[in-house]
Amino acid sequence: MEFWGVEVKVGQTVTVDPMDPVDSYIHISQVALGEAKKDKPNEPVVLYLKVGEQKIVLGTLSRDGIPHLSLDLVLDSDSELSHTSKSASVFFCGYKVLTGNDNASDFSDSSEEDEELALEGQDNGKPELKAEGAKVTKPSKSIPKIGAPAKAADPKKDEDDDSDDESDDDLAGEDESGSSDEMDDDSNSEEESDGDDEETPAKKVDQGKKRPNESAAKTPISAKKAKTATPEKTDGKKSVHVATPHPSKKGGKTPNSTKGQTPNSAGQLSCASCKKSFTNEAGLQQHKKAKHGGQ
């Protein structure tokens, strides 16, 4: 490819031969009007192209309005360029492309070279891993050898560990049972104290005869006793008060609700004044303070 241009003077015609000196074609991309004398009037200039017997109008130029014009014209055979200007030349320009065998071989060689360069660029862009130069990073911790025999597990040590675990479980079970018994005793004493506190104002009302209806005062007390205590028969002995556990007293441990509660193994305690029986000393003391003024 090379630059091409031609000047068509006033009153002349220029013949264009794309095949001279070698096979090629001409691409006309622009045409412009040359300088003219000032005293000459502004006249329109018509551009012509003659191919064989056919004459084609390419466009019209004017010095003040359209001094140049863009074209997209390809000439591959003999042609003639002309114009109608009487005061200025017209310039045609573009480029010439060779189409001969030599040019084709040049283009093929250049394309092959471009392909080789592209392939080399792809190879260079990829990192090559060499087996000889590659180094494996060593781990910070030592790796045990494959051939080294593994140590046999000691059966005696395993048996000792199992026995220790069983003993820990037994101790934990005893602690839970002890804590549940303590919670049962506390709940018994609290329920008895609540019952005594409710009975005391009821009796005072009866003594002062402030309320004639005695059944109305005693009704809520018996209802509460029916809910909180359940009598149990034990071999001809007196009925024993069995308390319902209160799990909300201690947040850390919850008593076993399914486990039945038994009376105190030390025996029953009875009040000397009213002959009421209690399962522990704390309940008896609270009863004396509430019913008999601490006697």
UniProtKB/Swiss-Prot annotation:
GO MF annotations in UniProt: hydrolase activity; zinc ion binding
Compartment list: Nucleus, Nucleolus
Top-level taxonomic group: Eukaryota
Keywords, ordered alphabetically: Chromatin regulator, Hydrolase, Metal-binding, Nucleus, Phosphoprotein, Repressor, Transcription, Transcription regulation, Zinc, Zinc-finger
Composition bias type Polar residues, residue spans: 254-271
GO cellular component, one term: nucleolus
GO biological process, one term: chromatin organization
Biased composition (Basic and acidic residues): 123-135, 200-213
Record bears the keyword Transcription regulation: yes
Transmembrane feature ranges: none
Start-end of Acidic residues biased regions: 109-118, 159-199
Region named Disordered: 105-271
Stretches annotated zinc finger (C2H2-type): 269-292
UniProt xrefs under InterPro entries: NPL (IPR041232), Znf_C2H2_type (IPR013087)
Function: Mediates the deacetylation of lysine residues on the N-terminal part of the core histones (H2A, H2B, H3 and H4). Histone deacetylation gives a tag for epigenetic repression and plays an important role in transcriptional regulation, cell cycle progression and developmental events.
Similarity comment: Belongs to the histone deacetylase HD2 family.
Name listed for the protein in its UniProt record: Histone deacetylase HDT1
